[in-house]
Amino acid sequence: MKKKDLGIIRSGLEFITLETLETLDEMRQEFSQIAMGIFSDEMFSKLFGRKPIKSYSERVRLASALKGVDFVFEVNDDTNLKALPPIYTPSTEPKEYHIAYVPGTFDLLHEGHLQHLLMCRDMCDILVVGVNSDKLVWGNKGKRTQMSENDRLEIVHNLTFVDYVYLVETNDKSVANNWVKKNLGSPIDVILMGSDLKGNKNEDNPNGIPIVFTDRDPKFQETNSSSYWRKKFKELNTNE
């Protein structure tokens, strides 16, 4: 059956969930292109009777980061559909590294994650993201994630600028390096981490692979942490 030209999804998109991805998959079966409309702050308040917990620009960037979305537009009282600029455009410029490995938990994917991953993407030809398992997070931090490892893995896998995703079950980076060599035919050239991980056991690297730290915008340091958004997520679900 021939697909229809354009499918449109309208959403508040405060968080990317498996339901978001399932909706995109269903739409992809029927339409050759998908447009996602994000409610403006004013429209969100009008529809849901409260302010969104993430700004319009943050919600747009989440939508733009998804592989199944061809373009994003603002949903407001204006009926005109105007496509917004994409969050990421592939570059043909030579990169500093061939294969970069980025480990992390990526719970309740947020702007801080996007900033970090986009910086990493600009530094390499191939971006491999390691998503920490539930067991590893508990062992390292003594707390549980809001989203399961399968959900977090699937969400990161569906980001347009991520090439490969790997479930991390140990702090031993040689295991990740072996996985990359087996699946990509070459070893990791660099490990990229957020600067908030400096000075702890994440820096231990007996394999000699360079570790480079990226800096988040200090202006958004508080709201760019998963612990902040776990609290907001719980408050949101308690009030509904």
Region locations from a protein language model:
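Nucleotidyltransferase catalytic core that binds NTPs
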Residues: 1-240
